[in-house]
Amino acid sequence: MEWSLTQSKLLAFHRLMRTDKPIGALLLLWPTLWALWVATPGMPQLWILAVFVAGVWLMRAAGCVVNDYADRKFDGHVKRTVNRPLPSGAVTEKEARNLFVVLVLLAFLLVLTLNAMTILLSVAALALAWVYPFMKRYTHLPQVVLGAAFGWSIPMAFAAVSESLPLSCWLMFLANILWAVAYDTQYAMVDRDDDIKIGIKSTAILFGRYDTLIIGILQLGVMALMALIGWLNGLGGGYYWAVLVAGALFVYQQKLIANREREACFKAFMNNNYVGLVLFLGLAMSYWHF
């Protein structure tokens, strides 16, 4: 019986950290890889790559824990989240806090193997991860904070590789914020009706009937900034084809969200994994030395 209870708790932690749903980690991973490949340029050192890949998974898990901790009083009133570990009682508040601390400490131990500039920047990463979940109570722009949190690995990657933060770093950071606002607005469109009822704020509510238009403008901004990064770094034509393919995926997403149906909006959100992948492949091929 004791083993069964332990197994149930581990499964609850697994769900709390969303390790059963890798989409969030992938949306965090792709910009990290973009930055590492541009900063190097090309293939980064294997240890630095390993630290950032592991750090992505640890900090995404930590972010999910603190997000559910912040929303524990709201999730019980939303159909999609009512069975999450905290509102259902599968994980206690103390256990969630302890799990968050363990995940953050593991990530910080990895960062300690890098240079001082990267270690210093990691403090801001922790602050953003902690602050984001609470923003939806106070502002209709929590997605901007999410973009900063998901994109903070970009300056950290540049710092780890070159101990500098060039223009390309900040253009990529801005592109990631625009992208995150676009895809997380799609995600928020799924819960918009429930969020209005319980007082949660989001860009999906703020944008209202202009949501699809503004998402389209943000997506155009992402393409423009990524193309500019390619030009600044002298990338080849294959990279720009990747940017165009990403644009085609954005067009597909616009078609999906046109009628604002929940399942279609969620499908559009999930499709952003391919946007990140395509842009990374474009970068990797541009730096490939035959």
From Swiss-Prot:
Q: Where are the transmembrane segments?
A: 23-43, 46-66, 99-119, 141-161, 163-183, 212-232, 233-253, 268-288
- The EC code for this enzyme is 2.5.1.39
Kindly give the Pfam families that the UniProt entry links to this protein: UbiA
Q: Which GO terms of type biological process are on file?
A: ubiquinone biosynthetic process
What UniProt keywords apply to this chain's record, in alphabetical order? Answer: Cell inner membrane, Cell membrane, Magnesium, Membrane, Transferase, Transmembrane, Transmembrane helix, Ubiquinone biosynthesis
Organism per entry: Salmonella paratyphi C (strain RKS4594)
Q: What's a Gene Ontology MF term here?
A: 4-hydroxybenzoate polyprenyltransferase activity
User: Its function?
Assistant: Catalyzes the prenylation of para-hydroxybenzoate (PHB) with an all-trans polyprenyl group. Mediates the second step in the final reaction sequence of ubiquinone-8 (UQ-8) biosynthesis, which is the condensation of the polyisoprenoid side chain with PHB, generating the first membrane-bound Q intermediate 3-octaprenyl-4-hydroxybenzoate.
* Catalysed reaction equations from the record: all-trans-octaprenyl diphosphate + 4-hydroxybenzoate = 4-hydroxy-3-(all-trans-octaprenyl)benzoate + diphosphate
Q: What is this entry's stated membrane topology?
A: Multi-pass membrane protein
Q: What is this protein called?
A: 4-hydroxybenzoate octaprenyltransferase
Keyword Phosphoprotein assigned to the entry: answer is no
Predominant location: membrane
Taxonomy-wise, where does this protein's organism fall, top ranks first? Answer: Bacteria, Pseudomonadati, Pseudomonadota, Gammaproteobacteria, Enterobacterales
Cofactor(s) needed for function:
Mg(2+)
The Swiss-Prot or TrEMBL record describes its family as follows: Belongs to the UbiA prenyltransferase family.
Tell me where it resides: Cell inner membrane
Its pathway? Answer: Cofactor biosynthesis; ubiquinone biosynthesis
What cellular component GO annotations does this protein have? plasma membrane
